């Protein structure tokens, strides 16, 4: 019995099956975790006891983005270190002020460009290096970089500010590269699991941002010395990275996880040449090593994910364009009143905490609601509508500004509302896009497709951060 054509094939956790001809019906079925999870012949599907795998993936999601979030949210620390530490009020030369004013943009570019390159590398390594090697190695590198940053917290860098800046950018590039390998490897792993596990991982990423924002606020409130608060900040990140290593090792011991992590035989239906019969080897059979392709077929994956890829690029372009380069430079209209809520805590509250919490809420909603579907024209329409948020943020009290002198929204409530809308839309729509991608291809291509989806995401982040860095000089 022949398989359906490529356009009508959907991926379950363990098999490929003929999708209904009606697109709306197909979308609904593709989103039902239970229906997508057909057990292979001869194997009984185990239950996720006590939601152990779900919790582990959620924690791994936190750990995957925690290093980046901790780097970005430590704004006061970077401002302190990039000035003359012993005399912050002294006159800096124009080059030092340029580094200080546009540091967030430099940091964003340093994180997105290496991320893009290492996503390509990870795509090539999918079938060459085992996933547990990639995960543990990337976590170890991130942990080592944070140890270096912890040591530098207490080092007086006032005599080599530019050298410290270069070292920080290099550390950010390494952190971004290792985090990319970790995130894409774990996200690819969830492609073989039911959809709820991918949702847990993606929601965990938003929780990582929320945790870092809360930790920053607590540190700022509890410590008068920015170095002490940052030391506690970075130590927390290092401890959690170590915890992630332990949790990942624990994951492979769960019966539920072992069931979905077992090897899969190659399926020829996706080659574009012919359609195999359903009598081909089942998904549970183990493929001989000599038959496993070293590099997944990129062309068919790009074809199947073209629409979702456009959505991913557009979504993250807008988000990276606004955060952190634009949003962190929006000041309270009442900054001069002397209140800490309109000065010291304004950016941590209205940008980092609010955005990450709204992002988390948007991602959690996808655990119960998954509309529009992967074939719906409404999905790209909603994504494109987010471009309207860019001018709204620019017309808030962004400082410094030399050319665009008009501040249209002269109330602090506007950046709060815009940030909520940005976070909710980013969380909900990006989660839908990322969990759809690996589910519209055969299971053995799920990990490679996950890497491709993250590649789309990184392209959007890189373009957004680069455009924001350019735009800042014209505002």
From Swiss-Prot:
Note on domains (UniProt): Contains a N-terminal dileucine motif (DE)XXXL(LI) important for endosomal/lysosomal and mitochondrial subcellular localization.
Single Gene Ontology BP annotation: uridine transmembrane transport
Principal location: membrane
Extracellular side, ranges: 73-105, 156-162, 221-230, 327-340, 399-415, 472-475
Modified residues (Phosphoserine): 21
UniProt entry keywords in alphabetical sequence: Cell membrane, Endosome, Glycoprotein, Lysosome, Membrane, Mitochondrion, Phosphoprotein, Transmembrane, Transmembrane helix, Transport
Topological domains annotated Cytoplasmic: 1-51, 127-134, 184-199, 252-305, 362-377, 437-450
The encoding gene: Slc29a3
Protein name: Equilibrative nucleoside transporter 3
Residues the UniProt record annotates as site (Important for acidic pH-dependent nucleoside transporter activity. Acts as a pH sensor): 219, 447
Organism: Mus musculus (Mouse)
Pfam families: Nucleoside_tran
Purpose of the protein: Uniporter that mediates the facilitative transport of nucleoside across lysosomal and mitochondrial membranes. Functions as a non-electrogenic Na(+)-independent transporter. Substrate transport is pH-dependent and enhanced under acidic condition, probably reflecting the location of the transporter in acidic intracellular compartments. Proton is not a cotransporting ion but most likely change the ionization state of the transporter which dictates transport-permissible/impermissible conformation for nucleoside translocation.
